[in-house]
Regions:
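Conserved SAM/SAH cofactor-binding pocket of Class I
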Residues: 35-129, 154
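Mobile active-site "lid"/loop adjacent to the S-adenosyl-L-methionine
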Residues: 122-151
Length: 245
């Protein structure tokens, strides 16, 4: 049995990711999001809201020369993210900030970023203590105790440059809510991918990209399947991890 706070190391596409078992560990949704985000040569500044152990920032650093900032509220988690950045030699392009994104107007400038990404807390918290984990730090990563999706969208709209992109991953049952929030804050939904555990199943996750002050036009891209007909991880998923899983 592992001790509380024990560290593990996971290999992801050639990178070594340090995690702690008493904090929310990265999962497939973060890996999917990191690979969903579109980056081009004009992308100079990227913000990763709620960076956790830094995995999304690390994925983006492998495919971009942009300046990446990951902001994380939980101090211990931000320390792990810094270690991951240093372990994988991305300290020249990734900066980790331990702060509350709600202080955005004191930390960042309006219209500062070309790209903003987030893997937000998925679940609403209504004050019912039975909803949450015994470990407060994990509950804060899974439930919107500290911040809501609407607050994240509103803040991102403020920080994005005109025609900048905002990408997020979320549970499929919140799709209507998320699309409504994006348009409310002038982030025009442009493309989406659905993720299924297997064929014949309902979608579990959605990945959406929205562009600030863009014209209308929406594309639903080819779906992602996690498992094939034999119950094995699909080649697409194996490729994301860079190894047999």
């Amino acid at each position: 049995m592992r001790k509380n706070g024990e560290e593990t190391r996971t290999v992801l596409d050639g990178m070594e990711i340090i995690q702690r078992n008493n904090f929310q560990n990265f999962t497939l949704d973060s890996v999917l999001l990191g690979n969903f985000v579109k980056i081009n040569r004009k992308t100079k500044k990227i913000l990763d809201i709620g960076t956790g152990c830094g995995v999304i920032s690390l994925i983006l650093a492998k495919k971009s020369k942009a300046e990446i900032t990951g902001i994380e509220l939980q101090e211990k988690m931000s320390e792990v993210a810094i270690r991951n950045v240093n372990t994988n030699n991305f300290q020249d392009c990734i900066k980790i900030i331990n702060d509350d994104i709600k202080n955005y107007d004191k930390i960042f400038s309006k219209d500062e970023f070309d790209v903003i990404v987030t893997n937000p807390p998925y679940f609403d918290y209504d004050g019912n203590i039975n909803q949450i984990s015994d470990l407060t730090q994990i509950s804060r990563a899974r439930h919107n105790i500290d911040i809501t999706i609407e607050e994240i969208v509103k803040i991102s709209a403020y920080l994005l440059k005109n025609n900048g992109s905002f990408s997020m991953v979320f549970r499929s049952d919140r799709l209507v809510e998320v699309l409504g929030l994006l348009t409310k804050y002038n982030l025009e939904p442009k493309r989406m991918k659905n993720c299924y555990t297997g064929k014949g199943k309902n979608a579990k996750l959605c990945l959406v990209e929205a562009i600030k002050d863009a014209k209308k036009g929406f594309v639903i891209e080819e779906a992602i399947y996690v498992y094939d007909e034999n119950g094995e991880k699909t080649e697409y998923i194996k490729k994301l991890y860079g190894k047999d899983i």
